[in-house]
């Protein structure tokens, strides 16, 4: 018989840097999950990813206090900031432009995020990432 799901916990945790401090500890502690077990498993799974990159994770907690988790790709905004070499987006994206990204970089980000995005093809996903870039105050060059 399948285990009964108690809760879903969604977090963004820095790759390879999960530890029992907030936000991980309190979120999982409320569900009665072994926090260190999650931290070790998460850090092992995100070993191949650049350390410190925020990774969205969905943790499924079962009624017997066991858990499974699924990691996703980093948010598009984080990947765009990294590609443009900036710390943060523009406060006024329509007036102040803070950086530039090329179409090739945007396409590469779209291909990276393809597994997590809803879209029929890479072109549609590329347009979506371009929209995110524009809303951050980045200029997309051909």
Curated annotation (Swiss-Prot):
UniProt keywords, alphabetically: Methylation, Ribonucleoprotein, Ribosomal protein, RNA-binding, rRNA-binding
GO cellular component, one term: cytosolic large ribosomal subunit
UniProt cross-references to InterPro entries, sorted A to Z: Ribosomal_uL11 (IPR000911), Ribosomal_uL11_bac-typ (IPR006519), Ribosomal_uL11_C (IPR020783), Ribosomal_uL11_C_sf (IPR036769), Ribosomal_uL11_CS (IPR020785), Ribosomal_uL11_N (IPR020784), Ribosomal_uL11_N_sf (IPR036796)
PTM remark: One or more lysine residues are methylated.
Classification via PROSITE patterns: RIBOSOMAL_L11
Function, in words: Forms part of the ribosomal stalk which helps the ribosome interact with GTP-bound translation factors.
Subunit record text: Part of the ribosomal stalk of the 50S ribosomal subunit. Interacts with L10 and the large rRNA to form the base of the stalk. L10 forms an elongated spine to which L12 dimers bind in a sequential fashion forming a multimeric L10(L12)X complex.
Listed name of the protein: Large ribosomal subunit protein uL11
Species: Serratia proteamaculans (strain 568)
